[in-house]
């Protein structure tokens, strides 16, 4: 093995299998590009992104960890979101939730 070498098996890797998803149309109504990372709570993204925020609550982009989606000014694109897993508690971001996503 060479240092830093990856040994990848043949086949497909399925991301987020069995998790709830939703597809939304998202438009950047701002005058600057907006980039959203893979694990950002999509509900709390920049207000210049226009989409159905209620459907995005408790969701993140359904993309590989460490990647992002960029929205250029005036651009509209479809994105698939996936439900956050784990304890489903959200703190930080824009401070819109600051606690449990699900009602007790």
From Swiss-Prot:
Gene3D superfamilies: Urease, beta subunit. Pathway: Nitrogen metabolism; urea degradation; CO(2) and NH(3) from urea (urease route): step 1/1. The keyword Hydrolase applies. It holds the Pfam family Urease_beta. Belongs to the urease beta subunit family. It comes from the Bacteria. GO terms for biological process: urea catabolic process. Keywords: Cytoplasm, Hydrolase. Heterotrimer of UreA (gamma), UreB (beta) and UreC (alpha) subunits. Three heterotrimers associate to form the active enzyme. CDD domains: Urease_beta. It is found in: Cytoplasm. This is Urease subunit beta. It is an enzyme of class 3 (hydrolase).
